[in-house]
Amino acid sequence: MPERKAGSVMRTIGISHKTRYWQHYCFSNPPEGFRYERMVDIPWHIARIRVEFLANTKFFLPFAKADLYHTYNGVVANAHPWVIEVESYMPRYETMSPGNPLYKWALRRLAGPHCKALIFTSQSALHRNREHLLAAGVDPAKMSVIYRAVEQYEPRGRDADHFTIIFAGNGFFRKGGVELLKAFKRLGRPEARLLIISTLEVDWGVFPEPEVIAWAEKTIAEDPCITLYRRLPHEELIRHMRAADLFVSTTFQDPFNNTVLEAMGTGLPVICSDVGALPEVARDGRNGWVLPVANRTSEEIAEEITARMVQLMDDAELRVKMGAANAQIIADRFTLAKRNAALTKVYDAALGG
């Protein structure tokens, strides 16, 4: 990271929110020479107004001053310099036609002079958006990939009598919870334990039949080797990860699935899918396995998960090797130092150095 000159002015980056854990971690640890401050925008959610355009458009009120705004998925309406961090599609008006005047307005804002940079959280997100943004007149020099940072923890020490597998994510069915349940039941190993942190909700993307939902809930409730926490503070999730043996989430739809990265931060081998940014996060065969899920049946995915779990259970040396591989993978892409060095360049360019 470039050094700041003595006596240089601290510059304020106004952020829209830091509700997710990774945002709290990253925005609580700004690059040198900058500070993050929460800006006030119109709180549509408090008024229970759930309009896609309003939810993903930011108009900051003049209660606090910032040198630059940094939003997460939100197009800024203010006549003020801003950068936007993008995890999936942009503009984030999923149900809106590209011919809609509001959609066209958002593209003009992204191409306009006030938008200084589009920061994609993965190459996958950049690839998804690049062509239509270029067609809208967005300067390709504005676009870059800056990965999230993850906090790292030492393992707490595993339970020698059990092999603990963790799943975390409220969108249980979308994130591959059913396939993990099937795999766990096939495992048939008395030392295996499954810890699920989830509200078991059906959120978006995957809509299982009622009998599948009923089977999952019944299986979880009746198996004494499965523990369910519907709500758990994040620090407790991390505590459980640090004492576990494996994290599994073969999600079907996700732009990033940050819990995989958080599991890696605790030194866990991971079994995940090849969806979204995950092939950029995990390394197949190095710190776990990245499984294809498209055009495969639930049974086929479950069968492969079972095989990989058995492989790790029967090979302690491989388990240790895969867990230890996380440190270098994170060091290459997902540290605060890497993120903040890249953000410093973006912020400096946006503010004229």
Which residues make up each language-model segment?
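C-terminal "capping" alpha-helix adjacent to the active site of nucleotide-linked donor transferases
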Residues: 295-320
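Conserved donor-binding/catalytic core segment of Leloir-type glycosyltransferases
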Residues: 157-186, 194-197
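A short, well-ordered alpha-helix in the C-terminal region of glycosyltransferases
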Residues: 311, 318-333, 342-345
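Short hydrophobic beta-strand element within catalytic cores of glycosyltransferases
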Residues: 269-272, 279-282
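Nucleotide-activated donor-binding/catalytic signature segment of Leloir-type glycosyltransferases, i.e.
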Residues: 198, 208-235
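Short alpha-helical donor nucleotide-sugar binding micro-motif in glycosyltransferases
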Residues: 231, 239-244
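Aromatic "clamp/platform" in nucleotide-sugar-dependent glycosyltransferases that forms part
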Residues: 252
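A short, active-site helix/loop in glycosyltransferases that binds the activated sugar's phosphate group
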Residues: 112-142
